[in-house]
Amino acid sequence: QPRSRGLGDVYKRQALISLSDLLTDWELILKRVRKCADADMVIALYNPKSKKRVDHLKEALDIIREYRDAQTPIAMVKNALRDGMDYRISTLDDVDYDFCEMNTTVIIGNSQSYIKNGKFITPRGYKL
């Protein structure tokens, strides 16, 4: 499972947002991203990229950067719980956009999130 592979327990206050604008207006999606970033939520983005939507993830992360430190952890999980699963953990200032594709989930930490021993951690209120 992704948690056991390096993500740790990242969820405390979280939001799950699709970046697909096929059925939802892009401006509404960006509004949701902004509201969740402002609320300091851990944000999971899915459907981040397609052949036609190559810049949606960058645009969403640019908004999140307005509210988060450059060292905020970010995880990209490709093919979660499927054959060929792979993941990368980095920070908002070191995003590997080439790793991302349609079947990638992108998780952005909140102000309490950090990376320790290669693990992405968002504490739930007690000391680890």
Task: Describe the role of every protein-language-model region.
Residues Q1-L7, Y11:
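Single conserved hydrophobic/aromatic residue that forms the stacking wall/gate
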Residues A39-L128:
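A contiguous loop/helix-start segment that scaffolds small-molecule binding in enzyme catalytic cores
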Residues R13-A37, K52-L61:
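Anionic-ligand binding region
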Residues G8-D9, L30-V33, Y87-D94:
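Short, surface-exposed amphipathic charged segments that create phosphate/polyanion-binding patches used
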Residues D9-L19, D93-M102:
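A polyampholytic, Gly/Pro-enriched intrinsically disordered region
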